[in-house]
Amino acid sequence: MLMKTTTVHAPASQGTSGIVLDSLRVAYHGNVVLKPLSLTIEPGEVLALIGPSGSGKTTVLRAVAGFVQPAGGRILIGDTDVTHLPPYKRGLAMVVQNYALFPHLKVEDNVAFGLRAQKQPKALINERVTQALKTVGMSDYAARYPHQLSGGQQQRVAIARAIAVRPRVLLLDEPLSALDAQIRHNMVEEIARLHRELPELTILYVTHDQTEALTLADKIGIMKDGSLIAHGETRALYQHPPNRFAAEFLGRANILSAIALGITEAPGLVDVSCGGAVIRAFSRGSHHGYNKLLCIRPQHLSLTPRSAYSNRFNATLQSVHWQGDLTHLLCDVAGETVRMVLTHVNPLPRVGDKLALWFEPDDAVLIEV
């Protein structure tokens, strides 16, 4: 069930505040839906929490907002333990997908709503509303009513209403999922711009869309079955996922059977038997002789070597799929299917051709089975 868009009418923040979840646990009627979770979101950081439906990501956000009472653990916003505080005392704002603007109020009055609830001076309200609408690019729509706006414009107004109260933390719960693809793409860019303009704002962004997460977040947390199974800086987590679920949830990945043969003289790299060849790949540990999986993103494969250290798989082309700017090739590598994505391939290889697939050691990572 969707929640109403909520602005928490707390006093404006003093400086930046991060979020600390300390062994946070949530249970409904004795059924544990969020296993003990510890996570730190640094002040001014954007953390995207992603995962499939029922993974617990929205439960985390609702607990931070104060709509769910934890069964254990603590929640800190800045230096304040807010675990048992009501939502309106937490100094945060929240926006979800069904923007819930007041239909009888003009845009400017919707944005001013939280400030008026705080009983702020009229001059301050006018200043904050003007600034918030300017920030989201809606200054020219201040006198319109919600029904006169598109879905994307309504979502901008909802975000303006949230930031107008100057929250310490902004919670976004799948705010773009009700929009069509092009508007959603534009709104992702708008939210990224918003954070550039408000770098002191700490954002917890919950989504099932990995593209939104990869575009917006400084760090990503991946949820599964009520547990946080991966967490790290966005680029590092995408490049070197710790396990198969994280690798595949963040985008397409080739997952191949592999055996680690031992460490090399190069820091972080191990020799690996995979795809009928001995290659080098990134590893978080000094594995030797264990059955592992090798993860390689399709776009990290090429038809020509990029360096003297490039790895090589011998492959047979199975199929070619052209999709505008991209060409998708499916290849057989030692009995396993490998996908690669290329741009501007001319001439295109033909089905049945023998190919050499090249990739850099750091673009391949050993992960757990």
From Swiss-Prot:
Report the family membership. Belongs to the ABC transporter superfamily. 2-aminoethylphosphonate importer (TC 3.A.1.11.5) family.
Q: Which NCBIfam families did the record assign?
A: PhnT (TIGR03258)
The way it spans or sits in the membrane comes to: Peripheral membrane protein
Q: Which UniProt keywords apply?
A: ATP-binding, Cell inner membrane, Cell membrane, Membrane, Nucleotide-binding, Transport
Which conditions up-regulate this protein?
Induced when inorganic phosphate is limiting; this is controlled by PhoB.
Instruction: From the Swiss-Prot or TrEMBL record, give the protein name.
Output: Putative 2-aminoethylphosphonate import ATP-binding protein PhnT
Locate the residues binding ATP: G51, P52, S53, G54, S55, G56, K57, T58
**Free-text function comment from the UniProt entry:** Probably part of the PhnSTUV complex (TC 3.A.1.11.5) involved in 2-aminoethylphosphonate import. Probably responsible for energy coupling to the transport system.
Give the UniProt subcellular location, in the record's own words.
Cell inner membrane
Q: Which PROSITE patterns match?
A: ABC_TRANSPORTER_1, ABC_TRANSPORTER_2
**Taxonomic lineage per UniProt?**
Bacteria, Pseudomonadati, Pseudomonadota, Gammaproteobacteria, Enterobacterales
Report the residue ranges that make up the ABC transporter domain in this protein: 19-250
